[in-house]
Amino acid sequence: MVKIRLTRGGAKKRPFYQIIVTDSRNKRDGRNIERVGHYNPVAQGAESRVVLNMARVEHWVRNGAQLTDKVRSLLKEVSKTQATAA
């Protein structure tokens, strides 16, 4: 099964996550199929907290990819900010 989930990067006490498409059997920080965005939970000021390539996410979801709970909530956050910006 293909999943869209987070993989951790960054330094100790300063997490940074890539939003990736991967097979569910792969390790958390293992091999991935495609990187579709990133998430910075400690973003401050003008830094962007979540960046997603919505076209690619929609493509993978149409082709059967499952979203993890955290990625689903980030997707809602991005769509909400895009709606208020438009």
Curated annotation (Swiss-Prot):
Alphabetical UniProt keywords: Ribonucleoprotein, Ribosomal protein
GO molecular function, one term: structural constituent of ribosome
Protein's UniProt keywords contain Ribosomal protein: yes
Gene Ontology CC terms, in alphabetical order: cytoplasm; small ribosomal subunit
InterPro entries in the record: Ribosomal_bS16, Ribosomal_bS16_CS, Ribosomal_bS16_dom_sf
Alphabetical GO biological process terms: translation
Superkingdom in the source lineage: Bacteria
NCBIfam families named among the record's database cross-references: S16
Family according to the record: Belongs to the bacterial ribosomal protein bS16 family.
Name of the protein this chain belongs to: Small ribosomal subunit protein bS16
